[in-house]
């Protein structure tokens, strides 16, 4: 059964915003209570958060579809809907977020670093929030916006200070098991290690992590063997340790040629040219291994490598190797800027962006694109004529009508607002020609202006009663 996964495809869907409420206040003896519809709640975000306790992407391999909760709709009596709950997804330190095309969206390094994979939709305004001096009792509310949906790829690049690289069965797993408390699978056949193993090493006052990367073979940079699956795990390491087998039984191999092959694969993979290298000649506890190590050590040192003769079985040379690595890591940490937890958002919301474009397409449709027009369309209930009129007013104030006229649009031409796959298309009627039908001051409560016969009769009765009482008081028979 799979227990380690370092690459998954994830579908993240944020919550939709709740719809606003169109409601009129109802209370005894208050016939004109006014609008009291509450706003809809915000949809929940989908957030990736780095957690040090998480070491694999296995959970998302089994369950790749994740959705945050929706915001609740508003209600009467000025009650706003509850916001949707954010969906927080823990990921390992070193997770890289990519889009489907392979472009890097975020590199999540450091405990607490967050990435907003999908933003929840805004809640719609209720009619109480839409009321104004001219629109005293709106008979509509705004719809909640849909949350963002995005397909992303998560790749784990192990965050370790040291990477052990080498041929299969060179003794990397044995070496990490004696340098640290790691318990990797160890056997005498190639590709025993199928996933990176991490261990923690303490050398004096320096504590660092070491990674045992699965064995590399010729063609690894092109994906041969376990190749590209695990080469990315060495990208973040401060130092590379070439583990060379001095007791190999294969006649066509020797430690120097193994080193040259691994270096060529690292060169082809790219990005590791300036990384410090150390050579660990392993298995020198075997007599033939010690003899071969003595032969090739001068050649390796002449190339500029620091060479250590080690044996995982006999525990030879381990202290010297661990302290040498600690020195290199301490220098690297001193020059590396401190990484702090950050919050990464793919596309921040444009708060004051009033920009939009109008283009004439080949099919004769005038297409309007812009953050505000598209958002307003998503918020409009097209089954409500008053809401549609409110949208027309907003677009006119933004300058969309003027831009359509300048672009050559005439009454009856088709206008589309939004992208091709999700646009609202309608026949345009300029406000100048349609104004006679739209001058009713939308949202106005005509009950405030029109005479009410019942109230008038009540006032007349009160006046007659007052007159009768006055006449009675003035009457004096004596």
UniProtKB/Swiss-Prot annotation:
Keywords: Cytoplasm, GTP-binding, Hydrolase, Magnesium, Metal-binding, Nucleotide-binding. GO terms for cellular component: cytoplasm. GO terms for molecular function: GTP binding; GTPase activity; magnesium ion binding. Its EC number is 3.6.5.-. Residues 348-430 form the OCT domain. It is found in: Cytoplasm. Coiled coil: none annotated. The keyword Phosphoprotein does not apply. Residues 469-478 have a biased composition (Acidic residues). GTP binds at residues 166-173, 191-195, 212-215, 282-285, 311-313. Residues 61-87, 436-478 are annotated as: Disordered. Residues 439-468 have a biased composition (Basic and acidic residues). PANTHER family: DEVELOPMENTALLY REGULATED GTP-BINDING PROTEIN-RELATED, MITOCHONDRIAL RIBOSOME-ASSOCIATED GTPASE 2. Overexpression suppresses sporulation although cell growth rate was not reduced. Impaired differentiation was eliminated by addition of decoyinine, an inhibitor of GMP synthesis. Overexpression has no effect on streptomycin production. Belongs to the TRAFAC class OBG-HflX-like GTPase superfamily. OBG GTPase family. This is GTPase Obg. It comes from Streptomyces griseus.
